[in-house]
Amino acid sequence: MQSQFDKICKFKKFYKNDENEKYNIFVIPIFYYDKYRRLGPKGVYKNKSEERQLAFIRNLKANIENLHNGNIPSNWKFRIYYDKSLTNFEYEGVKVWNKLFSVISKSNKIQLIRFKCSRYYSCKKHCKLFGTLIRFHPLYIKEKNVISVNCIDSDNYISTKRLNELIKFIDSKYDINVFCSKYEFPRYKDLSRKDNFECYFRAGLISSKISFGEKKWDEAFADIDNPKSNFTKSFNNIIKHLKVFFPDEIQNKDNLYFEFGFDEIFLNYFIKNIIYKEKYKVRYVHYQPSYT
């Protein structure tokens, strides 16, 4: 039976699987958001859309080079979820994503999937940073070829240290792996809710060897769309503490749904709930938080 989410979201795969192949996937979402504003020096906001796109391209190229010629084991692949907004980005007169995809699509280690979610789509692009949530989609679907799903940020380079920890996780008894710090402020977490975990989860630093199930994915988006859901109440609590601790971040924003940090709100609410209720075993890799 088709999930409710898949009725409003279309995924077009540009790769084929070997039926007997088993592999691990790094998952990244890539899209173009032309209003990616971040607070800079002296409290001045700057549009960093172009800067972010160039960082995505630079790190993706480095990761793919490492995948083919570096220390990433042969049973790993990159899965890239993207939407048509990338065609809106040009740099020095070149549609760089079209050029890059035409090259990497020939590799059997790259899985390109184009997505379009009609409910969250208008004017040739998805709502704000909605695309960041799509990286979690493989956590909820069962794929017989996939050993583990490893969510990363689009501008992250897979370091040797991180890769070694993921390899340890795959060979371990644990279901979930997270890189986190006990000392990091839970910026996008509801501080009024009890948390049974050692630390705040980051959206680009979680891995899983189990599938949460498509029903849970549907339920999450039903709650997101419901103004009276417990999630909405929790989200409003987060906005309240952002107004206290990070007022500059939310100024001049009338609707914070799918804004920066929404993927971590999703992770620390929905995915943590599943892990806790199902009693999945979590492996923690602690690191020193960055305050820059």
What would you call each of these model-derived segments?
Residues R135, I152, F201-R202, D263:
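Residues that flank catalytic or metal-binding motifs in active/ligand-binding sites
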Residues F56, C123-T132:
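A short, glycine-/small-residue-rich helix N-cap motif at loop->alpha-helix starts
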Residues K173-I210:
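Short beta-strand-to-loop element that shapes/binds the nucleotide-sugar donor at the catalytic cleft/hinge
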Residues F31-K35, S85-T87, C117-Y120, N156-S159, ...:
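Short, solvent-exposed loop/turn segments at secondary-structure junctions
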Residues A203-T292:
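Catalytic core and acceptor-binding pocket of nucleotide-sugar-dependent glycosyltransferases
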